[in-house]
Amino acid sequence: MAKLHDYYKDEVVQKLMSQFGYHSVMQVPRVEKITLNMGVGEAIADKKLLDNAAADLAAISGQKPLITKARKSVAGFKIRQGYPIGCKVTLRGERMWEFFERLISIAVPRIRDFRGLSAKSFDGRGNYSMGVREQIIFPEIDYDKVDRVRGLDITITTTAKSDDEGRALLAAFNFPFRK
């Protein structure tokens, strides 16, 4: 079991219960899932780029990514409905906790010119979204084998009812918010 999950059960739950005055353990917000998304617009011209992006995402997450397809045709972007244009992974359970631990302790500190993550990137319902400009911050990616530096979106979905609850939950995990 991931250390962060044990830490959540042992310490974070008690801390949040006293902070927000919850009566039941089930009221305490928890991390539900983490979604990783990589949009590969250049895949229209070269299908191999999408395969490389999917391989990178699989290495980062430890799970086979789902290839996302265009929902509708857009002439300006030269895409048709059904074209593969990206890939995504939804992590839950044990894999989610392991990824969350690696994200906080290893990957985020390796971001160039890192001064903390914005605390304003919540969606109003306690879910946090962030963008990573380079996939090479993850130790699973071999720098020498990277064909192109790509970014990815990371969304942390919580059961929090408000942004304040979500912020308190992530702050309890020592999430590196900008001061």
From Swiss-Prot:
Leader peptide range in chain numbering: none
GO MF term (any one): tRNA binding
Keyword annotations from UniProtKB, A to Z: Ribonucleoprotein, Ribosomal protein, RNA-binding, rRNA-binding, tRNA-binding
GO terms for cellular component: ribonucleoprotein complex; ribosome
Family matches, as Pfam families: Ribosomal_L5, Ribosomal_L5_C
One GO process term, biological-process aspect: translation
General function of this protein: This is one of the proteins that bind and probably mediate the attachment of the 5S RNA into the large ribosomal subunit, where it forms part of the central protuberance. In the 70S ribosome it contacts protein S13 of the 30S subunit (bridge B1b), connecting the 2 subunits; this bridge is implicated in subunit movement. Contacts the P site tRNA; the 5S rRNA and some of its associated proteins might help stabilize positioning of ribosome-bound tRNAs.
Family named by the database record: Belongs to the universal ribosomal protein uL5 family.
Subunit structure: Part of the 50S ribosomal subunit; part of the 5S rRNA/L5/L18/L25 subcomplex. Contacts the 5S rRNA and the P site tRNA. Forms a bridge to the 30S subunit in the 70S ribosome.
Protein name (Swiss-Prot/TrEMBL): Large ribosomal subunit protein uL5
Organism: Proteus mirabilis (strain HI4320)
